[in-house]
Each structure stands twice: as C-alpha cells, then as structure tokens.
From Swiss-Prot:
UniProt xrefs under PANTHER family: 50S/60S RIBOSOMAL PROTEIN L16 (PTHR12220), LARGE RIBOSOMAL SUBUNIT PROTEIN UL16M (PTHR12220:SF13)
Assembly behavior: Part of the 50S ribosomal subunit.
Protein family according to the UniProt entry: Belongs to the universal ribosomal protein uL16 family.
Signal peptide: none
Name of the protein described by the UniProt record: Large ribosomal subunit protein uL16c
Species of origin: Lactuca sativa
Amino acid sequence: MLSPKRTRFRKQHRGRMKGISYRGNAICFGKYALQALEPAWITSRQIEAGRRAMTRNARRGGKIWVRIFPDKPVTVRPAETRMGSGKGSPEYWVAVVKPGRILYEMGGVTENIARRAISIAASKMPIRAQFIISG
C-alpha cells in the first residue's frame, strides 16, 4: 500500500475540499484515463484495490499509471476514549481528490480492454468517475 516514506509533521488538519482540480486534470502518460467527478478522500487501500483490478483485467498487455498519492494522514481515537487528551494517532493515509482529477491512466491496450479494466477500477472507488480518452 502507498504511504510517504517520511513527512515533516505526523498529524494534519482535516481541511476542506472545495472547487475543482486545476492540477493533475489532463492525461499525461497513457491514452485512456479515469477522471473523478466528485470530491473525496481516497484511501491507500482503495487506490491499491483499483490498481490490482486494472492489472488483473488487462492481463500482461499495457501499462498503468497511478496519478494520485496518499500523502494526508488520518488520525483515529481509540474506542471508548474520553474527550480531551489530544489528537488520536495516525491510522491510515488518504489522497485528497477534487472533481476533474485523473486517478489512473492506461496505455498500450485496445479501447475495449481499457474501458473494461477502468470501469472495474471505478467500481472500487468511493466516488463517481468517468472514462476519458486523450486527444
């Protein structure tokens, strides 16, 4: 699963996801891509599940690029803990995704194989996403 090797700070504020993605919203590497249509936090487990599904479906052909990286730590308090006594410990990592962001790219395969593989990866995501073709 993806996570940063080291960060400057162990914990982060939650922040808010407003607006659309101005960076990472164009196809750069492959010919086909999966584009987010809603804002969400996508966990490293979800990213990995989508990547595995695409790889398995494409068999040996083609190349896959993951265009998002989970660099935000999410902290969780232990169950049945009283209020106060600080913020919880980091539990898992998420990628902050805004509408328009490219999640995965694919190249070196035919369109129907790419469409099938990317639609399976889209079903693993917690958001609505669309299949797009470069050019």
